[in-house]
Amino acid sequence: MWNAVDRLLEKAIGENAFPGCAIAAGQRGKVLYTNVSGYLVRDGERLVKHSTRYDVGALTQVLVTMPLCMIAVERGLLGPEDTVDRFLPEVPADKKTITVAQLLTQTSGLSPHFLLQEEARSDKDALGALLRHPLASPVGGKVSDSGMGFLLLGFLLEKVFDMPLDEAAKRFVTAPLHMNHTGYLPSGSDVAPTSIRDDNGVLQPGCPLDGNARFLHGVAGHSGLFTNLEDATRFASMLSLNGRTEDGVFLSQRAVHLVSTERTRGMNAARGYGFHITKRQNPFLGMLWPSDGYGLRDPASGSAIAVSPLDGFFTVVLMNGAYTPANRAEGERFLRQCLNAAYAAFQHENGAEDCEA
């Protein structure tokens, strides 16, 4: 059944949906399937490899920012209920009641997106510009996916840990998980370029696609991270084991429960801390995935991570697409097809005794 996933990837690459892709699937720490297909760039000659590092955009939010928040909670450095002005005293009155939990669940009321370069006097004024920008909706009123909330969390975490965000990410997340090929601003021949080019039209591998991440010199809480299949699979495997790794406990089981279960009941969308929660009325992971599976997709590149707590199944998809609002729905459809095929293959191979009715 895994060949159905293979065929989907081959078809999408053949139709020029994206140049290259890497996918892994497994259960409770055991990898069951991997596939690497395509090229580093469109119409290119260099094949992607298992070691290829991809710009994962919004997945930065769950690979770096969310775990740093939960590590800070476990160490007593902050609480989800803490308001942002506890750590950032310059927060204006209209944003003083925003909590860490609301930033994590996308219910802060911050604007979904705006370009810092248009409102900040310089990169040093980025936080000020973010705080000056008017709210888009009342604080805590509704779910509205906003990279700006995780961008703000990045600034907040630098205060909490008293170090730059990329240093905190390495010290507390990527190094303990042995994610040795994950980080900001990578270099080398194994980096899949985004569509960003220099003034001479030359592609710039390691330069993130997100404009606000670039304005912040590649390091931000909402975007900018690069990773490869092995490292992203390590992270997904840890989640599927409720925070455990071969070295011991990375996150407590309760912390994983907090991030992976719905925290927005009664609102317009189901969100955990950083993750979207799939529901029967909104099966964003695909109809075959059990309700309460969780994950996140980067809308620009198409990369995604998904975990089913029911049976410990997980899937990681990394790709170097360049989706725009005009074709984003096609990217979402492809991901659902891919995740459905992967989950079906898992069920056929392992039986369906864990599957809900």
Q: Where are these predicted regions, by residue range?
A:
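Short, surface-exposed beta-strand/loop micro-motifs that present aromatic residues
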Residues: 301-310, 314
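Active-site SXXK
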Residues: 6-10, 23, 29, 52-81, ...
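Short, conserved catalytic-motif segment at the N-terminal edge
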Residues: 2-56, 77-79, 128
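Short, gly/Ser/Thr-rich active-site loops of penicillin-recognizing serine hydrolases
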Residues: 241, 245, 255, 260-263, ...
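Short, surface-exposed loop or secondary-structure junction motifs
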Residues: 41, 94-292
